[in-house]
Regions:
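A charged N-terminal "starter" segment
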Residues: 1-111
Length: 112
């Protein structure tokens, strides 16, 4: 049985809350973003605070987008997922000394 695009029968055996990611829809969305932003004078960055699931991050990084991070942990997750350090921006306020060192040690693009 399906409800919209969701195969409900696959989910009936799960007894715990979970997230369902439609990877095909993500792929189509990322394709469209890349297509619409190529040859533009700006660069797309994904905000890790929205969702730091490593599988999703790897997929997004594979499109050549940058990462917008607001913590040292997000900087590390971005690098681990394959975002080039040259496209990692560390934004936000209240960075600890340790977080600043993480950014510097990984040679990220900039601090905001």
């Amino acid at each position: 049985m399906t409800k919209g695009q969701f195969p409900l029968d696959k989910f009936q055996a799960l007894e715990t809350p979970f997230y369902y990611y439609d990877m095909e829809l993500l792929h189509l969305t990322l394709d469209k973003i890349k297509e619409e932003t190529e040859n533009k004078p700006y660069h797309i960055h994904y905000a890790l605070k929205a969702n730091a699931n490593p599988v999703l991050l790897k997929r997004i990084a594979s499109y050549g987008f940058g990462a917008d991070c607001v913590s040292g942990n997000e900087v590390l997750r971005a690098i681990e997922a394959g975002f080039p350090a040259s496209q990692v921006v560390f934004a936000g306020v209240g960075k600890t000394d340790k977080e600043i060192v993480i950014g510097l040690d990984n040679d990220i693009y900039c601090f905001n």
